[in-house]
């Protein structure tokens, strides 16, 4: 399931990110690519070990930790610290699949990549081309969101970033290990959680149907969650 997560960052935060990024030198994006994906990857990245990368990454992680739609859709166990990329001058990233296991930089800890995330830091009108194209069982989805918004999709999906024909596309990208690894189970829990939230607003927290559905949600979490 593909989820649009709006307003992860405010417009003011996005502008701060962009201003700070202008102060440092970008590097070849192949440094974080796997063997196969490196053959189709043409972009630039902020250096993984730069203090600014850590600083901006922490701002995103803090924002995600309090974003109700992200928490409902991802059911995150852990998040690989965000990285940042830039596309310009016909740069692109051809169809590929993300590595199933990734190491958290600076540690020996490894995480399973259940969900892939792209947080847009450029407005759609700032560039042409550069669409994120995600392939799933329902076809191809072309994604270009406002700055500060994020797309969340299963890491099992083939995807690409089409060539930039003008302007510049800046984004953050990262992965989530979910407590619920199966996408179909996560989707059911998401729909159930959203239904519970809507009923709470309509009927109140103490209504019997709200309590029953909340009980069902937590029992399914007990059945499916891996910690």
UniProtKB/Swiss-Prot annotation:
Top-level taxonomic group: Bacteria
Molecular-function GO term, any one: 2-oxoglutarate-dependent dioxygenase activity
Pfam families per UniProt: 2OG-FeII_Oxy_3 (PF13640), PKHD_C (PF18331)
Alphabetized NCBIfam families for the sequence: PRK05467.1-2, PRK05467.1-3, PRK05467.1-4
Protein known as: PKHD-type hydroxylase ABAYE3291
The enzyme's E.C. designation: 1.14.11.-
Entries under PROSITE patterns matching the protein: FE2OG_OXY
Keyword Cell wall biogenesis/degradation: no
Signal peptide: none
Keywords: Dioxygenase, Iron, Metal-binding, Oxidoreductase, Vitamin C
Binding site for 2-oxoglutarate: 169
Cofactor stoichiometry and binding remark: Binds 1 Fe(2+) ion per subunit.
Record: residues binding Fe cation: 96, 98, 159
Any GO BP annotation: DNA damage response
Organism: Acinetobacter baumannii (strain AYE)
Residue intervals of the Fe2OG dioxygenase domain: 78-178
Cofactor(s) this protein cannot do without: Fe(2+); L-ascorbate
């Amino acid at each position: 399931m593909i989820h649009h997560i709006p307003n992860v960052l405010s417009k003011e935060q996005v502008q701060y990110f962009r201003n700070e990024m202008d102060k440092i030198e970008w590097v070849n994006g192949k440094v974080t690519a796997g063997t196969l994906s490196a053959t189709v990857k043409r972009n630039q990245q902020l250096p993984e070990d730069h203090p600014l990368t850590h600083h901006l990454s922490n701002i995103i992680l803090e924002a995600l930790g309090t974003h109700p739609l992200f928490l409902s859709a991802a059911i995150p166990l852990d998040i690989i610290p965000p990285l940042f990329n830039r596309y310009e001058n016909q740069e692109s990233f051809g169809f590929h699949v993300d590595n199933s296991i990734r190491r958290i930089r600076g540690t020996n800890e490894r995480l399973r990549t259940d969900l892939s995330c792209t947080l847009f830091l450029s407005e759609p009108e700032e560039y042409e081309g550069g669409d994120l194209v995600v392939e799933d069982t329902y076809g191809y989805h072309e994604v270009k969101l406002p700055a500060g918004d994020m797309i969340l999709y299963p890491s099992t999906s083939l995807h690409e970033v089409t060539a930039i024909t003008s302007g510049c596309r800046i984004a953050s990208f990262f992965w989530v290990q979910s407590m619920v690894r199966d996408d179909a189970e996560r989707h059911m829990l998401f729909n159930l959680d959203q239904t519970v939230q809507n009923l709470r607003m309509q009927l109140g927290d103490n209504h019997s149907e709200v309590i029953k559905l909340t009980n069902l949600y937590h029992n399914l979490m007990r059945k499916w969650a891996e910690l």
